[in-house]
């Protein structure tokens, strides 16, 4: 149906009407600024989450993104999180059966993970091991959330052991460290 107005105000009105808090910009390299301005104009600000990578300036209104990464041994630092510590990335690696890399990179970067089991009708269930790891990471991250927007975030903080990587998250008088073991074996000793 023709709403009688351009898409940005029509979408903003609809999102306000249904009480939505955001829009997933599937396949988009950034939700255009016009949508954010229209949402603000109707008094119903929205979180925009494009699938692709928006321009750096678009982080001002694309406050979330998907994180579709390669997972090298040394964890990559999420560019958008680095530029804007309040930016929330949701790691999406929908076809991978082992979610270890997703969870480690999310934990290292202080960002989220998208648990997507039914991918357009194709089942890619989460294993009991990954489900338990997800529960543990969420249990640690939820009470520490204020640290993960620290402008003093220091990714790739030096560590003593091979294959052990950390991010340092200072906030006031306290600091949180997120530490990941990228080895395929356990590591013990001072870090």
Model-identified regions with their sequence ranges:
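Active-site-adjacent "subsite" loops/lids of carbohydrate-active enzymes
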Residues: 1-22, 29, 72, 80
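Short intrinsically disordered, low-complexity coil segments enriched in acidic
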Residues: 2-6, 176, 191
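Structured segments of extracytoplasmic/periplasmic soluble domains
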Residues: 14-17, 26, 41, 109
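Hydrophobic residues within beta-strands of alpha/beta enzymes
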Residues: 23-26, 114
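Short His-Asn-centered micro-motif
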Residues: 25-28, 49-51
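Active-site-proximal substrate-binding groove within the catalytic cores of carbohydrate-active enzymes
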Residues: 34-35, 39-190
